[in-house]
A protein has these predicted regions:
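Conserved ATP/PPi-binding loop(s) of AMP-dependent carboxylate-activating enzymes
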Residues: 79-86, 96-127, 163-165
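Conserved ANL (AMP-binding/adenylate-forming) active-site segment centered on the GW(Y/F)…HTG consensus within
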Residues: 72-77, 113-137, 154-155, 171
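AMP-binding/adenylate-forming catalytic core of the ANL superfamily
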Residues: 110, 115-116, 139-229
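Conserved C-terminal "lid"/linker of ANL adenylate-forming enzymes
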Residues: 158, 184-189, 199-200, 222-278
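Thr-Gly-centered strand-to-loop micro-motif
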Residues: 24-25, 92-94, 108-109, 129-130, ...
């Protein structure tokens, strides 16, 4: 949806009147993206946030079609709806279930939850409890009315100075900066500090090679992230389009991206990094 907003200029020949529903569920859906898409293409209540995973036979919660969306009080996250019929959801932390509105790991129980991973009982024990609750590895919260909000992936959390940073919060800031096509935030372990360091990778348009302009873009990214999140990125890496790895369903592969950064694998995909220009 975001690519449509950014890359389609003339919409006069586009007619979406026959489209009744468009579901979004690969990543936590952003209110700003939906609003921009619907405004640009002249549609309303078309995009439906949803949540599911293969281990739960896909559908866990699906927002009702043609129903106004439900943002959380901060306006950052959209509800994916109440659990589907026959599905139970609870949010837990290390101590157990948490109160409404508190973020934690999403756990699911339903007849559709898998019995286990094929020929892998150890992996099964890690994610499925003896009483049938599936640990999804996803972060979220449930409000007092029972609506589920998905905020990110537990394994993607960036811990800087003892504070948890959700990558999508950083990416939401960076993606709105002119000159950035797409971005990803990852945490890279630091042997010196024993903590993680925030790295921002931003794809810029093909042909962007003005050193002064790229340096200015890096400074703006650092400034805006610091203003919005209270942390300065340790490094900002500007890369060519298509560099950020994704799954077949469009999810950012942050662990793979972290490996690419730590292993120096960006190579000629790197355009500019923390003040160092790469031809």
């Amino acid at each position: 949806f975001r690519n449509c907003v950014r890359n389609i200029g003339d919409t006069s020949g586009i007619d979406l009147s026959s489209v009744t529903q468009a579901m979004s569920g690969a990543e936590p859906v952003r209110l700003s993206t939906i609003e921009a898409f619907e405004k640009k293409f002249g549609v309303q209540n078309l995009i439906t946030p949803a949540y599911g995973l293969a281990e739960a036979t896909l559908g866990v919660a699906i927002w009702p079609r043609r129903t106004p969306l439900r943002p959380d009080p901060s306006g950052k996250f959209l509800s994916v709806g109440q659990p589907c019929r026959g599905v139970s959801v609870r949010i837990v932390d290390e101590a157990g279930p948490v109160a409404p509105g508190v973020e934690g790991e999403i756990c699911v129980k339903s007849p559709g939850v898998m019995q286990g991973y094929y020929n892998n009982p150890e992996a099964t024990r890690r994610v499925v409890s003896p009483d049938g609750w599936l640990r999804t590895g996803d972060l979220g919260f449930v409000d007092r009315e029972g609506y589920l909000f998905v905020t990110g992936r537990l394994k993607d959390l960036i811990i800087v100075g003892g504070e948890n940073i959700v990558p999508v919060d950083v990416e939401e800031i960076v993606d709105h900066i002119p000159g950035v096509r797409y971005s990803a935030a990852v945490g890279i372990d630091s042997e010196r500090t024993g903590s993680q360091r925030l790295h921002v990778v931003a794809e810029v348009r093909e042909g962007a090679d003005d050193t002064e302009a790229l340096s200015g873009l890096v400074r703006e990214i650092v400034q805006r992230v610091h203003q919005g999140r209270g942390h300065r990125p340790a490094r900002v890496l500007l890369v060519r389009p298509g560099t950020i790895p994704k799954t077949s369903s469009g999810k950012i592969q942050r662990s793979r991206l972290g490996q690419m950064i730590a292993g120096g694998e960006l190579g000629d995909r790197l355009v500019y990094a923390s003040g160092a220009h790469r031809e």
